Curated annotation (Swiss-Prot):
Keywords: Allergen, Cytoplasm, Lipid-binding, Transport. It is found in: Cytoplasm. It comes from Acarus siro (Flour mite). GO terms for molecular function: lipid binding. One of its GO terms (cellular component) is cytoplasm. Its main location: cytoplasm. FABPs are thought to play a role in the intracellular transport of long-chain fatty acids and their acyl-CoA esters. Forms a beta-barrel structure that accommodates hydrophobic ligands in its interior. InterPro entries: Calycin (IPR012674), Fatty_acid-bd (IPR000463), ILBP (IPR031259), Lipocln_cytosolic_FA-bd_dom (IPR000566). This is Fatty acid-binding protein. Belongs to the calycin superfamily. Fatty-acid binding protein (FABP) family. It comes from the Eukaryota.
Length: 64
């Protein structure tokens, strides 16, 4: 099963990626400091993915 909580350990070349997107220095540093946690839960054919960080929280639910 994929149920569980996952925490970002590292993101190689993330600064270069953000710079290529055109983000300024301050915004890039804020984004780099975020360490999101993703919680995945499955109930039958329903899936929920919750992402939480200091910058933004999101939740996506869907059925397969």
């Amino acid at each position: 099963q994929i149920n569980g909580s996952y925490k970002l350990e590292k993101s190689d070349n993330f600064d270069a990626f953000l710079k290529e997107l055109g983000l300024n220095f301050v915004t890039r540093n804020l984004a780099k400091s975020a360490t999101p946690t993703v919680e995945v839960s499955v109930n039958g054919d329903s899936y929920t993915i919750k992402t939480a960080s200091t910058l933004k929280n999101t939740e996506i639910s869907f059925k397969l």
